[in-house]
Amino acid sequence: MKKIFIKTAMASMLCMGFVSCADELNIKSVDPLNHQTYTVEELLAKQYATLGLTGQKGPADLPDIKSGDEGETGFIRSVFNLEELMTDETLWAYQSNDGMTQITGMNWDKDNPRVNWAYQRLSFDINQYNFFISEQSGSLSEDKIAEVRFLRALNYYYFLDLYRKAPFKDTFDNNLPTEKSGKDLYEWLDNELTTIEPLMAEVGAYNNSQNFGRADRGAAYALHARLALNSAVYTDGQIKDYQKAI
């Protein structure tokens, strides 16, 4: 009888030990980078990051856009390539770079990798902005949403400036984009900037170390002026909005 009691007691103690160990293993992550809630500034930082970063892990890993050189696919670099490298303002020594001789010689076509990288970057960024706007509208203040709408307009502006057309979407859903070109894309940009300008922060609101680089109303005014100054070019002479640049 004593042996049965001892065996039963020992088994019970072992079970209690297993339960205790199991409870101790059920712990939450203490990794400060692993969390599911984000501040407004963190959410906005991801949107602004599309202007400089090329992927999820820095210079070379998990790129947003597949290419032979991830560093070539960033917004600033890919747009700069198509805006400046064929002008007298730039002398590019590395002519062996992919597609470079066609760019600097003003003889590129749709198969040039640099033309494709810029196109894909603008499309990728716009998709990110559409997702943010869709998810956060009604949750964040209007001025924060207007900031991201400005970033989206900036990318559409470069579509207009570089390609004269864009695969257009201003929503995040499963529908395919439609093509807007010339006058239609110009008018959308004109209306969008007119709408968001009064919603954005006052000029100079972010001139401090905490918010340096964020777009305020002045950024929208500048983009709108640049759009208006080139209105006749973008619309084949159908619209001449030069007065809006004043």
Predicted regions: what is each one?
Residues 21-76, 246:
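Membrane-proximal, proline-rich intrinsically disordered regions
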Residues 160-162, 167, 204, 230-237:
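Short coil/turn linking the two alpha-helices of tandem helical-hairpin repeats
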